[in-house]
Amino acid sequence: MKRNINLFKCGGDKMYVVVVYDISLDEKGSRNWRKIFGICKRYLHHIQNSVFEGELSEVDIQRLKYEVSKYIRDDLDSFIIFKSRNERWMEKEMLGLQEDKTDNFL
């Protein structure tokens, strides 16, 4: 009997992704900005300054996050991933500095 066992899901359903990042441009930040830009360009389409979009599988999103996390400084930089399987809903995920401009209530 032949079994077809898929131990690793390579790909899966794709979802629409928007990536937005803000890197502090001190001496190390300039280098990090270039590295992050290059990583994002490999996975997504560049649409504006530090904004990218495209369709990625969950596996590719995890790879992107892993690669970028090497250059994000938690106290200075932010990297935001908006994900949606449906056009009406987006999931917001943040790495690094998490300053939410809409959260100003005491």
UniProtKB/Swiss-Prot annotation:
The keyword Nucleotide-binding does not apply. InterPro entries: CRISPR_associated_Cas2, Virulence_VapD/CRISPR_Cas2. CDD domains: Cas2_I_II_III (cd09725). GO terms for biological process: defense response to virus; maintenance of CRISPR repeat elements. It is an enzyme of class 3 (hydrolase). It holds the Pfam family CRISPR_Cas2. Gene3D superfamilies: 3.30.70.240. Its cofactor is Mg(2+). One of its GO terms (molecular function) is RNA endonuclease activity. Keywords: Antiviral defense, Endonuclease, Hydrolase, Magnesium, Metal-binding, Nuclease. Its EC number is 3.1.-.-. Mg(2+) binds at D22. It comes from the Bacteria. CRISPR (clustered regularly interspaced short palindromic repeat), is an adaptive immune system that provides protection against mobile genetic elements (viruses, transposable elements and conjugative plasmids). CRISPR clusters contain sequences complementary to antecedent mobile elements and target invading nucleic acids. CRISPR clusters are transcribed and processed into CRISPR RNA (crRNA). Functions as a ssRNA-specific endoribonuclease. Involved in the integration of spacer DNA into the CRISPR cassette. PANTHER family: CRISPR-ASSOCIATED ENDORIBONUCLEASE CAS2. Belongs to the CRISPR-associated endoribonuclease Cas2 protein family. Homodimer, forms a heterotetramer with a Cas1 homodimer. This is CRISPR-associated endoribonuclease Cas2. It comes from Fusobacterium nucleatum subsp. nucleatum (strain ATCC 25586 / DSM 15643 / BCRC 10681 / CIP 101130 / JCM 8532 / KCTC 2640 / LMG 13131 / VPI 4355).
